[in-house]
């Protein structure tokens, strides 16, 4: 049993603890219970309350005697008898179950909706009948007055199957492309279906007409919520004649009064996960909403959180046992969850002993084995002068010594050595002073940059020095004394930012690896101290190391996920604060100062270009010909020739004039060599 408390509400997990394999014999099970404390203290409320791999849905019959659950693999349904606290029967199915409904007060009439469009009926003896619906189904509800089953799924139609006549009736045509969930009000029979567009359509089964539409997707968007996609309806539940709760795929729960199209309250789970199920707890006016990560219990009037439940594995379904404080969960694991919350109500009558058990735990919250006793050997008794108490009720024989009351031990110790407390006090003071001295010296050696990293490296080096396996452990160079990494502890640019996203995501993995390395060093030390034996140690099986490594991997994966969720929440809060600042900020025009000696002509040129673009082509050609940029001439064959001259800037004109003057100056300074004539050569000219 595991006890957790949130908002001073205690939650008892009755399904936690180690489970024994089925193939173990009774003798080995009893031996394990004697040796293992966790196995001995576990509570198996219902025998074999688990599935082979995963549990998908779980429900309780109306009379409260039977608990039915479906799961895989292979697809099956299991029925548990609460009066016998054991499994009553198990039936394997052809395909996985999407959802099911118990039509009778006990388990004698059950309807299953499969993921391959089949609808399967079971009676008390077993399989009874099977039929199919036109499209894949996602949910269904049973209307008791007319004996109609309403199926919704990947279609705009709501299929109706009458169980009295044994045939399909005309379907209800909705305005949605697909429907996800549905529910029927037990008081007045109103049928409601949740669509993929985020709407809830309400129908009257008596006249088969739509009587109202609620736009939940629009109402779920609030100032505090952050929605990135269109919310679809993922859960639907009626409470009484006028109340209805709607869960969306973005993690919001909306409470409606059927007389209004506006929600009374919008509750956000802050996880962004689809709402799996919604339940009402009338005695305390609570709403229990669950997604795949958490079950939240909050007040339906104010929305104030009452308590929450976060299991180890993802949730598939949640069932509240009627008129009690017991909660059943279907998880992504073989074990099905059983939780008892005494504040919600008493324990069911088939497990009324839970009330007495929880009361005893509340009276003795810290009662652990031998906490109030001191273990002493026979030599210790001789030193204390208590050998005459051997065999009396004051001493309890255990192994090679005795257990005695801790208060009696302190009294006798004080009488034998009155100055023991003073000596103990002086030793403690001396130890504290030595520790502070060691820390003081260590702090002086730490660099200015990356002090925590340097402290971690120093601790690892000290552990290596203390280790007795210096030959077996491969010695690695110390980063602190290596000149290649010297800048990392001197330059502030290399400071590790512990608030960055990369550090927070990698830190759980690094810490797990360091812990695993320390654990391996301790194990190697223990092995060297013991005699070298080829046989396996007795207290631990051969696959224990692999199981521990897998547990470590699961642990750091959960820590990384937790850090990622915290980062997302911090990012969401920053965006909300930035949005509030932007809303409060008043924008003002900005002015720019032009340097002295420059002329601002951008507006004028843009206005001139705009006027030029508004003119016709003929006017633009005339204007360009006037400025000399366009030259039109006729050719001999009757065609026209256009020559465009690009405008030059002032700088280009100045540069061209300077080049012209330079060429003229060089021409004047040049000495001509035309007066020099060479002699004519003899022979034929070279060709």
From Swiss-Prot:
WD repeats: 50-90, 174-213, 228-266, 270-308, 310-349
Amino acid composition bias (Basic and acidic residues), ranges on this chain: 647-662
UniProt-listed Gene3D superfamilies: YVTN repeat-like/Quinoprotein amine dehydrogenase (2.130.10.10)
Phosphoserine modification, residue list: 25, 475, 514
Coiled coil regions in record: 423-476, 514-588, 639-672
Superkingdom of the organism of origin: Eukaryota
Record PTM Phosphothreonine, positions in chain: 481
Keywords: Acetylation, Coiled coil, Nucleus, Phosphoprotein, Repeat, WD repeat
InterPro entries, alphabetized: Beta-prop_NOL10_N (IPR056551), NOL10/Enp2 (IPR040382), NOL10_2nd (IPR056550), NUC153 (IPR012580), WD40/YVTN_repeat-like_dom_sf (IPR015943), WD40_repeat_dom_sf (IPR036322), WD40_rpt (IPR001680)
A family per Pfam: Beta-prop_NOL10_N
Gene Ontology CC annotations of this record: nucleolus
Chief location category: nucleus
Listed Basic residues bias regions: 663-687
Residue ranges of the region described as Disordered: 526-560, 643-687
SUPFAM superfamilies: WD40 repeat-like
List of residues that carry N-acetylmethionine: 1
Cellular compartments annotated: Nucleus, Nucleolus
Family: Belongs to the WD repeat NOL10/ENP2 family.
Protein name stated in the entry: Nucleolar protein 10
Species in which this protein is naturally found: Mus musculus (Mouse)
């Amino acid at each position: 049993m595991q006890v957790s408390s949130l908002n001073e509400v205690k939650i008892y997990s009755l399904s936690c603890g180690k489970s024994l394999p089925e193939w173990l014999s009774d003798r080995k099970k009893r031996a394990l219970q004697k040796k293992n404390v966790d196995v001995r203290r576990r509570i198996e409320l219902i025998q074999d309350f688990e599935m082979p791999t995963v549990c998908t849905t779980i429900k309780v019959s109306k009379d409260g005697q039977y608990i039915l659950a479906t799961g895989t693999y292979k697809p099956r349904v299991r029925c548990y008898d609460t009066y016998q606290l054991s499994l009553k029967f198990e039936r394997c199915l052809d395909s996985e179950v999407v959802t099911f409904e118990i039509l009778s007060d006990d388990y004698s009439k059950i309807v299953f909706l499969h993921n391959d469009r089949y609808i399967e009926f079971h009676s008390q003896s077993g399989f009874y009948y099977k039929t199919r619906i036109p499209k894949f189904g996602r949910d269904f509800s049973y209307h008791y007055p007319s004996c109609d089953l309403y199926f919704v799924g990947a279609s705009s139609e709501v299929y109706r199957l009458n169980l009295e006549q044994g045939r399909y009736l005309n379907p209800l045509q909705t305005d949605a492309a697909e429907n996800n969930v549905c529910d029927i009000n037990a008081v007045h029979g109103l049928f409601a279906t949740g669509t993929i567009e985020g709407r809830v359509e309400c129908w009257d089964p008596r006249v088969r007409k739509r009587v109202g539409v609620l736009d939940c997707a629009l109402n779920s968007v609030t100032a505090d919520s952050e929605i990135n996609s269109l919310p679809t309806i993922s859960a639907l539940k009626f409470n009484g004649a006028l109340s209805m709760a709607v869960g969306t795929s973005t993690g919001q729960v909306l409470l409606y009064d059927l007389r209004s199209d506006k929600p009374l309250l919008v509750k956000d789970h802050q996880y962004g996960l689809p709402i799996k199920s919604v339940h009402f707890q009338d005695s305390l006016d609570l709403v229990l909403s669950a997604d795949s990560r958490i079950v939240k219990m909050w007040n339906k009037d104010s929305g104030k959180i009452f308590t929450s439940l976060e299991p180890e594995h993802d949730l598939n379904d949640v069932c509240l046992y009627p008129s009690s404080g017991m909660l059943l969960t279907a998880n992504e694991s073989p074990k099905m969850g059983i939780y008892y919350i005494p504040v919600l109500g008493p324990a069911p009558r088939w497990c009324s002993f839970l009330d007495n058990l929880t009361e005893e735990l509340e009276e003795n919250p810290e009662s652990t084995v031998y906490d109030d006793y001191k273990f002493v050997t026979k030599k210790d008794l001789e030193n204390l002068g208590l050998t005459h108490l051997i065999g009396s009720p004051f001493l309890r024989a255990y192994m090679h010594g005795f257990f005695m009351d801790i208060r009696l031990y302190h009294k006798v110790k004080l009488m034998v050595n009155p100055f023991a407390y003073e000596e103990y006090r002086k030793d403690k003071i001396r130890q504290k002073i030595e520790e502070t001295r060691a820390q003081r010296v260590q702090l002086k050696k730490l660099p200015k940059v990356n002090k925590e990293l340097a402290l971690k490296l120093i601790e690892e080096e000290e552990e290596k020095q203390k280790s007795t396996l210096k030959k077996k452990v491969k010695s690695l160079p110390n980063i602190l004394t290596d000149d290649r990494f010297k800048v990392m502890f001197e330059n502030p640019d290399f400071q590790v930012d512990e608030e960055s996203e990369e550090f927070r995501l990698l830190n759980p993995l690094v810490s797990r690896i360091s812990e695993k390395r320390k654990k391996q060093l301790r194990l190697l030390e223990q092995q060297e101290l013991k005699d070298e034996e080829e046989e396996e140690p007795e207290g631990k099986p051969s696959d224990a190391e692999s199981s521990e490594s897998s547990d470590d991997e699961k642990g750091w994966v959960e820590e990384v996920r937790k850090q990622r969720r915290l980062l997302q929440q911090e990012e969401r809060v920053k965006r909300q604060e930035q949005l509030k600042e932007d809303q409060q900020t008043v924008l003002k025009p900005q002015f720019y100062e032009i340097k002295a000696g420059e002329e601002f002509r951008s507006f004028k040129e843009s206005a001139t270009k705009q006027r030029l673009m508004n003119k016709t082509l003929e006017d633009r050609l005339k204007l360009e010909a006037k400025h000399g940029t366009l030259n039109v001439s006729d050719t001999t064959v009757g065609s026209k020739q256009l020559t465009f001259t690009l405008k030059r800037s002032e700088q280009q004109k100045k540069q061209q004039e300077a080049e012209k003057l330079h060429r003229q100056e060089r021409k004047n300074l040049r000495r001509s060599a035309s007066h020099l004539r060479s002699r004519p050569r003899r022979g034929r000219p070279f060709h």
